Amino acid sequence: RVTTLADYNKNETPIEGSLRYGIEKSNQPRTIIFDVSGIIELKRGLYLNEYPNLSIIGQTAPGDGITLKNYNFTFNLSKDPAIGAGGSLNAIVRFLRCRPGDQFADYGEDAIGGRYFKDAIIDHITAGWSVDETLTFYGVQNFTAQWCIASESMNLSNHAKGAHGYG
């Protein structure tokens, strides 16, 4: 259960009730629901790599829902393309806005993306305001992106290759 919009970094004390704590506290099957709404200012990227068997149910947030800001939201199980789709992520993520912006981006960050995993659904996700692509998934199996919006990326931002953002 998410009860705070706060986030923490690797060298900081974990904050119980935060979205990151709910994701990282266990590999056991779990469902994350929200008692709060607003903007979560991420202190680092949010990765599901090591934390499978997860449902994030964003529509439980009251009011205007949840926006993730400052960093990307990534689904990866392997960084080796020779492996192809890695293990089962077994994840469902619904009703979130992913808008990293460029304040902390030091390379081509996507708003939400992932590679080399199996078994995941994203639903009613809005992805935008990224330095690189907004919604990027490849090398995956049994993956569904439904009722999602891939909106504008930041073409003239701080991408290492110059004008870049390709939506």
Locations of the language-model features?
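Short, conserved catalytic or adaptor-binding loops enriched in Gly and charged residues
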Residues: 1, 58-60
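Conserved positions at the start
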Residues: 80, 109, 122, 132-134, ...
